[in-house]
Amino acid sequence: MKKLLVLLLVPFFAFSQTNPNREYWQTNKWTPKNGMNAEFESAVAKKTQKFNNTKETSFATYQLITGPDQGKYMRVMGNRTAADFDADDSKELDYWMKNVMPFVESNDGNIRWWRMKGFSQNWDNDLPPARFVKMTTYTVKRGMMSDFLRFWRNNTELQKELGYTGITGLFMLTSGGESLQLLEVEPYNSHAEGTGKMSDPEVNYIEEYNKMHGWRTHRNDERAATAAIEELWGVTIETAELKPEMSSKL
């Protein structure tokens, strides 16, 4: 608990490397004390209603429903500028310490990301949080990021051309975790409907990829992108479900 308190007393929005033109996001996973989920949920809901009731201060809360972190609560602070992290949040942090921390067992620490807009598609920050999010984390080998992103960029370009309806955001870690880490976020509202589809479900995707980017480029780009990912821990996939009462209502 002592280490946890030290972590929380660090300025909530402080980080060293920023770009004024980037769009920043922050995530943190929280574990309530045993048997205190209801108290934790209620305390977070009250804090969110009090301090996070505008678009500029909003938070979304999701609960992990798959993976080793199943059951943890993930707080998401999104669509911020670098300047937003200079705001004085001492009152908000003090409230959290007094009213939420008594029900907290641990947290994983803040992780900050910036959204790579050119590698995202159909992303709209004005949309309400989706009921579900599928999150795929990629850890890329040093010196091989360009190989990974080339395949991603080409796929994004083709999917836009083919009328893909799904929403995808690609985020790069800027502080709080493994370097060279990327997070793919796919919001959706129904398992039955899935994350998206092409306008023509019968399209030969590989053939269209090669038409757009060159003969055999799909095979070569896919191999290069796969080789760029760390072998043992390079890909993790999680799914989370929105907790509306613990999220901002805008």
Where are these regions (language model features)?
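Bacterial Sec-dependent N-terminal signal peptides
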Residues: 1-21
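Short S/T/G/P-rich N-terminal loop/turn motif that feeds into the first structured element of a domain
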Residues: 16-250
